[in-house]
From Swiss-Prot:
Amino-acid positions noted as binding S-adenosyl-L-methionine in the UniProt annotation, renumbered to this chain: G77, F82, A128, E129, R146
Keyword Methyltransferase belongs to the record: yes
GO cellular component annotations of the record: cytosol
CDD domains with a match to the protein in the record: AdoMet_MTases
Keyword Repeat recorded: no
Catalytic activity, EC: 2.1.1.-
Protein localization: Cytoplasm
InterPro entries the UniProt entry points to: rRNA_ssu_MeTfrase_G (IPR003682), SAM-dependent_MTases_sf (IPR029063)
Protein name (Swiss-Prot/TrEMBL): Ribosomal RNA small subunit methyltransferase G
Main location: cytoplasm
Entry's family note: Belongs to the methyltransferase superfamily. RNA methyltransferase RsmG family.
One annotated GO molecular function: rRNA (guanine-N7-)-methyltransferase activity
Source domain of life: Bacteria
């Protein structure tokens, strides 16, 4: 069973799954597949691939950053809940907010959180550009995003939400370093500084991943993020 595989893999990183956590991942998989028949949540539906490329890949974030404290996390464009819901299952201490622009996905996540009996999770139907202008601007310890957009775009969506001294963690494929070179200028404009770039391989030759950790050094200028759609059309690039 794939949950046994996940349990064994995480054990090598010092994470021991309880019976409850194993059941939560099984429920997560079942609901993901059921809801995916009604709406587009993921192109990956084979059980072992979901455990490897969604669950394990999400949790791998914790191998390189300390998530054991009581932290506030905002996950931008999480889709079916990755990486924040697998991380919340492992680290119940996290206070998680997911922002997604599609109301159907928010409905799925609400049902999922109820089925998994998760507390301190909230789901917001909004564009990141709008959410980053509101009351929760500069209020999160960590803001994360996985496979949402290029880093030059993501930085403008995510860094305004990070509190000073917090981190924006971008989870990318093997092309993350290429994206980083393009995004460095905008990261600086938005008050960030690249702290680390970590490359690692998924098990079973499932591919390389890169985790880019950006420190929030100063407050983001008030004009950012720009209106919805603008960061994607005109990313902050050095001229």
């Amino acid at each position: 069973m794939s949950v046994a595989w996940l349990t064994q893999q995480l054990s090598t990183h010092g994470i021991e799954l309880s019976d409850k956590q194993q059941q939560q991942f099984q429920t997560y998989y079942q609901m993901l597949v059921e809801w995916n028949e009604k709406m587009n949540l993921t192109s990956i539906t084979e059980e072992h691939e979901v455990y490897l490329k969604h669950f394990y890949d999400s949790i791998a974030t914790s191998f390189y950053t300390d998530l054991t404290k009581e932290l506030t996390i905002c996950d931008v464009g999480a889709g079916a809940g990755f990486p924040s819901i697998p991380l919340k299952i492992i680290f119940p201490n996290l206070k998680v907010t997911i922002v997604d622009s599609l109301n159907k996905r928010i409905h799925f996540l609400n049902q999922l959180a109820e089925a998994l009996e998760l507390d301190n999770v909230s789901f917001v139907h909004d564009r990141a550009e709008t959410y980053g202008k509101g009351d929760y601007r500069a209020s999160y310890d960590i803001v994360t995003a996985r496979a949402v957009a290029r880093l030059s775009v993501l930085s403008e969506l995510c860094l305004p939400l990070v509190k000073k001294g917090g981190h924006f963690i971008a989870l990318k494929s093997s092309k993350g370093e290429e994206e980083l070179e393009e995004a460095r200028f905008g990261i600086g404009v938005l008050g960030g500084k690249v702290l680390d770039t970590i490359s690692y391989e998924l098990p079973e030759d499932a591919g390389e991943r890169q985790m880019i950790i950006i420190d929030k050094r100063s407050q983001t200028p008030k004009k950012y993020p720009r209106k919805p759609g603008t960061p994607n059309k005109s990313p902050l690039l050095e001229k």
